[in-house]
């Protein structure tokens, strides 16, 4: 006999069901966007993600992290989506732990193309969406996009960047002494000789950096190799298509030695050639301010190392000029930066990655200060800091041939190991041959 449910119980069940449904639908405010508002017109392509949350994990912390959160606030307000950001000083280690443990963030900002490739090869990363590809291609040069492209597929989009091809100097000292900013390598060496003849050491440097001691010297090699041999040889070198002790690399290293291992040139205000190895990166350029050294080759981010109250400007206490090319018709530039990559392909994750590749985010972040981007549509009027503005001008120059920091492209055992150690030993007395042979032998 078929069982029957009393009609009154059925009715009661229906009422309860309706009540539960109403509670589920009406118990909270339905998430909505504000894309219909005039101030949100730039975000109309990011619809359908209201109420969604996207997690981002990176190495950017403290004040810089706060500025990042401010930079995408308008995106959140207009789209109704939320970005949950976490910055850590242990990023390189912890991103591997999280990914391997199945706790990958939706998006990570990765500064090492080699690490991006590792995650691509492991199948962990998602390819960039069509929207991200279109946006990134419109806003960044192929020189940048290639560092996040593997087997013809784009996985990451550039975010922030820095320029390493700078020489810091004192505008006041140069003016008082009648020294002109050199525009070619030959002029740079001629100026160095002129300064040395006055009894002042023209150059100062420091490569001590704890467990990372040596990295500033690797930047010297990379920057000069781009000038000495050109971008094609540079590309062959970082991928080990030519050995580390190839004659072309020997040539560039010897050229660096004409400055860094020249007792008449270094180490102004600090000591002899060997003192470079024991002088911290942070202190390596400080004698420029006191006039005991004339020039210091270091990246745009060295602006943060000058003593409090130092005016960084073309008419200030310190400023920087472009590290001259050997061939004045060329403009090689060494730099680095972060790429946004995704470990999930939900629509909201794809939307955030596309937004971060846009001119809207680049300009939003630039207005907040202390930011450089290679985004071609970054408006220079939004970049207030003089050295940041000069960096953006260089990155946007159509003559610029950009190459990413070589040590970040090499296997970590080389780029963050034997290369650092080898260059430190080179500064303290080892020959170029011994040094390059040692580094080459470590490349497995």
What does each model-identified segment do?
Residues 87-95, 113, 185-190, 270-289:
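Short helix-initiation/N-cap motifs at beta->coil->alpha
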Residues 366-377, 389-444:
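C-terminal capping/gating helix-and-loop segments adjacent to ligand/active sites or protein-protein/ligand interfaces
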Residues 295-371:
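Extracytoplasmic/periplasmic substrate-recognition and gating elements
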Residues 97-98, 105-106, 137-172, 201, ...:
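A structural signal for short loop-to-beta-strand junctions that line the ligand-binding cleft
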Residues 155-158, 189-245, 250:
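Extracytoplasmic/periplasmic solute-binding protein
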Residues 39-48, 113-165, 216:
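Hinge/lid segment of periplasmic solute-binding proteins
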